[in-house]
């Protein structure tokens, strides 16, 4: 796919890119039809927050466990896609529950803030208050 040409390292196994956060392809567990819940299922399986692709859906979900001041929150983020759905000839009837978006992960020391950037049908999106069209 030309990853090397783009300076992208492909990891075949889950990759911890920040303490407590794992990047995975998304096919390591059970698929859920609700956006964000495949990633959250993987987060609960791995015991770390997860960012994944593969599902082509855009969603973020969280699960918190613990009691009182002793708790943790796991995040599951599915990054969506940037594909041309018209070229997905394998789709029956050309229909799929897929959303166009990209994920942005901001870190400040140990703090991590995941977010989704929805991409409009015309390919435009807004990030940090600026419209890209």
Question: How does the language model describe each region?
Answer:
Residues 107-133:
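A short C-terminal boundary segment appended to hydrolase-like catalytic domains
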Residues 1-10:
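Active-site neighborhood of divalent metal-dependent phosphoester bond hydrolases
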Residues 17:
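Catalytic cofactor-binding cores of redox enzymes
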Residues 20-117:
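Conserved beta-sheet core of the metallophosphoesterase superfamily
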Residues 13-14:
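Gly/Pro-rich turn-and-neighbor structural signature
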